[in-house]
Amino acid sequence: MTAMFRSFASFNYRTWFAGAVISNIGGWMQATAQDWVVLTELTDNDATAMGVTMALQFGPPLLLVSLTGWVADRFDRRKVLLTTQTTLMLLALGVAALLLTGVMTLPLMFCFAAAFGVTNAFDAPARQAFVSDMVSLEDTSNAVALNSASFNMARLIGPAVGGLLIVALGSGWVFVANAVTFLAMIVALLLMRTNELVPRVKNRASGGLAEGFRYVAGRPDLIVVFVMVFLIGAFGMNFPIFASTMALEFGQGADGYGLLSSVLAIGSLTGALLAARRDRARVRVLVIAAGGFGVASLVSAAMPTYWAYATVLIFVGFSTVTMLTTANGYVQTTTTPALRGRVLALYMAVVMGATPIGAPIAGWVADAFGPRAAIVVGGVAGLLAFTIGIGWMLWSGRLHRREDARFLLTLDETRPLSVVKAMQPRAFEDRATAATTPIRLPRDTED
């Protein structure tokens, strides 16, 4: 088994991956349909209403973070996921029924978006933490990256198929199709060999989420990761708003919008697969990806034609997934196992909770000044995140310039600063391969 796919050695992970691909395809089909329904069927191209829908859907993870992280740590994650996946399937059927009978309204769609958000608030941290239950710690970063690859394989297919189904059959049937795909994930969870799951570390302390907050507060590296992800998540990752309004600007319909989402996934899938090749997640990769995202977003905003814009989206997708996969893997592999669920709940609250803040703003900017202006705001947020990351690395001593123009890494990026013993910096050449080649510490300096 190659290094890129080493997590497939686990039966449970192979089963999970297969179910996730099918379910994620349906999820992307539904996301495309929901965005298009709000933008064109329930409103007259109102991007602000679309932003409100996204805020309602992604707000609950932020509001419920104190509960969802505790649930992910306290209860059997497989059973939690069976519950959330079944609930999401029933909600999809509910939306389908209202659309097919012609009684769906914007307030009702807002209510369903909030219900999806509440359910996903419990699903996301349990789903992320469950990855570490299926594979060893050494393979966790690889499994996280392959999860992202699964997500983006689905993103490559789902939006395009969803757009075609909207044109051919109508939006309601897309929600029906998504409900059916949830069965794949439910069956995969039922087929799990529970005796092969990695034993979980029980935390007997009663600190709840406060303990997770204290843990993150004592980890400057995690704080920087959270801030960078928040900035880009709030203002740069409003792709449904950007892609749908740009599709309309270029005179495209639902199929053109779906194709843009699929093109974005080409770069996303590439980024996920490259991340799977790395043996661990590193902060500097996250920082570089944030800068790449900012530049690619600004370039995309200037594109004069539909196909030129679509081409640049490949680079936007690549940098986005490289950043998110690295951040996720870093949080998972450097967090104390007993607190992993709570810390991941905080991370998911930052990732998903940033949307309620940024999406309405992006929608308003798109309505008032045009979609290109909204994309520029996202690009600037990416460059700001890059600046914060570089500034922290310089301030913390992780990275500094030498007179011979080579960079030095002075600390192991996969550990909290407090646990790394003092050592002399080790130089490496400033060339392209340095970004993906881990730097090994001498054995006698490791804990």
Where is each model-derived feature located?
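Alpha-helical transmembrane-bundle signature of multi-pass membrane transport and export proteins
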Residues: 1-429
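Long, low-complexity, intrinsically disordered segments
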Residues: 216, 430-447
